[in-house]
C-alpha cells in the first residue's frame, strides 16, 4: 500500500479573513534645520506626501487608513468577527454544499454559523459568503474550525476542514480591596490597569450590587450642583496606566436589621466594565461575583450611632450606642458597666440592667460622659456582661472625639 498518496485536490477553495476596523496610517517625520545641508528638502517631501496632514506634516498620524496587515491581537471582552468565503475554482457545478464554522475553546465548542442550511448548487466562479460574530468570554487558545462538505457531478461526496488557531489575551488587570466601616458600610476599591499596547476610552465602570446592598459611586465630585469626574474630562487610560474606582455599599434595611444575615462570606456584586479602543471598537468585561469576609463581632456587637465631632472640656455630652445580639439561637440578659479612663469619665450608674435581648435583635442606648483632657480622645471603658453565661465583653477605642477648651470654642 502506498502511504505517500498525492493529496486530493478539492473543487472548492475556503478563505477566512478576520474583520477588524482599519487604523490610521502612521509615518516617521524626518526634519532638519534650514541651515543644515539638506535645507528644505525634507520639508518639501513631507508637504508633497499625500499621507500627511496638510499644515501639520510633522504629525505621525496621517489622514489615510490602512487595512490590517496581520491577524493582530484579540482581547477578552471584544467581539471576534470573521469573513468566510467558499469559492468554486473548478469548471464544474458543485451540489449540496454545507459550510459549518465552530469555535473550540478550552472548555466548550460553539457553533458560529449563521445558517447551516445546505446550498443546492454552486456554479463555477461563484461563492458562498458568511460573516460570523462571537463575543470572546474566555482567555487562552481558541481554534476556529471551518468544515466544508459538497457533492461532485459524479455523485462523490467530498469533505475537508481547516483550522485557524489564535490566542485571546487579557486586556485589563482588575484588583479589588474591601474596607469595612463600623456602620456596616463596605467600601470597595477597584484598581483597573490597561495591560494592552493601545489607549482605552473607559466608557463605563459600574458596580452591580447583590440583593443585600445598595451602592453609591464615589468617583464624582459635586461642585455648584454639577458633577465632575475625579478623573477629569479625559477618560482615556493609557497603556500600563492604573485607575482607582471607589464604591460605597450599604446593607438594605431588611438585611441590616437581621444581625445574623451579614456574617461570614457575603456576595457584594460584580464589576461591569465597558471600553472602546481604536476607531470605536467596543469591549466589555464582567468580573465574577465579588465576595468579602464580613468582620466577626462575636456574640454581642456594640456600635456608635451618634457622637459629636467636637466637645467642650469638662462639659457632659451624649452618645448613642446600638447593642446587637449576633447570636441566632440564644437570648442574653445583659448588664452594662462603665469604667473611667484617665481622660474619659462616664456620667451615670454603672452596673445597669439592660434586660433580655433576643437573638438577632438590637437596642439603642444613650450614654453621657465628659472629658477632663484636651485633644483627640478615645472613648473606652464599656463592659457588657451576659448573666446567663457569666461572660464579659470589653469594648475599648469604640470612637474618638475632639476635646477643646470652653474659651477656644466660644471664640471660634
Curated annotation (Swiss-Prot):
InterPro entries assigned: TRAPPC13 (IPR010378), TRAPPC13_C (IPR055428), TRAPPC13_M (IPR055429), TRAPPC13_N (IPR055427)
Superkingdom of origin organism: Eukaryota
Matching Pfam families: TRAPPC13_C (PF23643), TRAPPC13_M (PF23647), TRAPPC13_N (PF06159)
Quaternary structure note: Part of the multisubunit TRAPP (transport protein particle) complex.
PANTHER family hit by this protein: TRAFFICKING PROTEIN PARTICLE COMPLEX SUBUNIT 13 (PTHR13134:SF3)
Family membership noted in the UniProt record: Belongs to the TRAPPC13 family.
Entry protein name: Trafficking protein particle complex subunit 13
Organism (species): Xenopus tropicalis (Western clawed frog)
Amino acid at each position: 500500500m502506498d502511504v505517500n498518496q498525492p493529496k486530493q485536490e478539492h473543487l472548492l477553495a475556503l478563505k477566512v479573513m478576520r474583520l477588524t476596523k482599519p487604523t490610521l496610517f502612521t509615518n516617521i517625520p524626518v526634519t532638519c534645520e534650514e541651515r543644515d545641508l539638506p535645507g528644505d528638502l525634507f520639508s518639501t517631501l513631507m508637504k508633497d506626501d499625500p499621507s500627511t496632514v496638510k499644515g501639520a506634516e510633522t504629525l505621525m498620524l496621517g489622514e489615510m487608513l490602512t487595512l490590517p496587515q496581520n491577524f493582530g491581537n484579540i482581547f477578552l471582552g471584544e467581539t471576534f468577527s470573521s469573513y468566510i468565503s467558499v469559492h468554486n475554482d473548478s469548471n464544474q457545478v458543485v451540489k449540496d454544499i454545507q459550510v459549518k464554522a465552530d469555535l473550540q475553546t478550552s472548555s466548550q465548542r460553539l457553533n458560529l454559523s449563521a445558517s447551516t442550511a445546505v446550498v443546492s448548487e454552486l456554479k463555477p466562479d461563484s461563492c458562498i459568503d458568511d460573516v460570523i460574530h462571537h463575543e470572546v468570554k474566555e482567555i487562552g487558545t481558541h481554534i476556529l474550525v471551518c468544515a466544508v462538505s459538497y457533492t461532485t457531478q459524479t455523485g462523490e461526496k467530498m469533505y475537508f476542514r481547516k483550522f485557524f488557531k489564535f490566542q485571546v489575551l487579557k486586556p485589563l488587570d482588575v484588583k479589588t480591596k474591601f474596607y469595612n466601616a463600623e456602620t456596616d458600610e463596605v467600601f470597595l476599591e477597584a484598581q483597573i490597569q490597561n495591560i494592552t499596547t493601545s489607549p482605552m476610552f473607559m466608557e463605563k465602570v459600574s458596580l452591580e450590587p447583590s440583593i443585600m446592598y445598595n451602592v453609591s459611586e464615589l468617583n464624582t465630585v459635586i461642585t455648584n450642583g454639577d458633577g465632575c469626574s475625579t478623573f477629569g474630562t479625559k477618560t482615556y487610560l493609557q497603556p500600563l496606566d492604573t485607575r482607582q474606582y471607589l464604591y460605597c455599599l450599604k446593607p438594605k434595611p431588611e438585611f441590616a436589621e437581621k444581625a445574623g444575615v451579614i456574617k461570614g462570606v457575603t456576595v457584594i456584586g460584580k464589576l461591569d466594565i465597558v471600553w472602546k479602543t481604536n476607531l470605536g471598537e467596543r469591549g466589555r468585561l464582567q468580573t465574577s461575583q465579588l465576595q468579602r469576609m464580613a468582620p466577626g463581632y462575636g456574640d454581642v456587637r456594640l456600635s456608635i450611632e451618634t457622637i459629636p465631632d467636637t466637645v467642650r472640656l469638662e462639659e457632659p455630652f451624649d452618645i448613642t450606642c446600638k447593642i446587637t445580639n449576633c447570636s441566632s439561637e440564644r437570648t442574653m440578659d445583659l448588664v452594662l458597666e462603665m469604667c473611667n479612663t484617665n481622660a474619659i469619665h462616664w456620667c451615670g450608674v454603672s452596673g445597669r440592667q439592660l434586660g433580655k435581648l433576643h437573638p438577632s435583635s438590637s437596642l439603642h442606648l444613650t450614654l453621657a460622659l465628659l472629658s477632663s483632657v484636651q485633644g483627640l480622645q478615645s472613648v473606652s471603658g464599656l463592659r457588657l456582661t451576659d448573666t446567663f453565661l457569666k461572660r464579659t465583653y470589653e469594648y475599648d477605642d469604640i470612637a474618638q472625639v475632639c476635646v477643646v477648651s470652653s474659651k477656644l470654642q466660644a471664640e471660634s
